[in-house]
């Protein structure tokens, strides 16, 4: 689909249509009801092929205003469409209670091709994942 148009689509309760641009990176953690219910030591990245994309995963303690004092972390994530690779770059920053090691489950969605999934362990240093 091209932008700048209205699309009327069936949307039954069990199947919600989503229009996601190529190059988009969507991140989510475990299902929780409150911030510190379970640590988000496993993050899923939904990466949509078709063009390059980038995303900064921002994290803080989720409870205090310490982010105003610079206590937060950012993990830059990039997708290179030509190489079909996802780079999870070096983490910058820190905060109390930060998760140092985690698993990223990366799902690459490519039009007309089965979704590919890879999992990697991340400890704050750059990792390149090739599909």
Predicted regions: what is each one?
Residues 1-85, 93-111, 123-124:
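Catalytic core of carbohydrate-active enzymes
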Residues 113-131:
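Intrinsically disordered, low-complexity linkers and stems that provide flexible hinges
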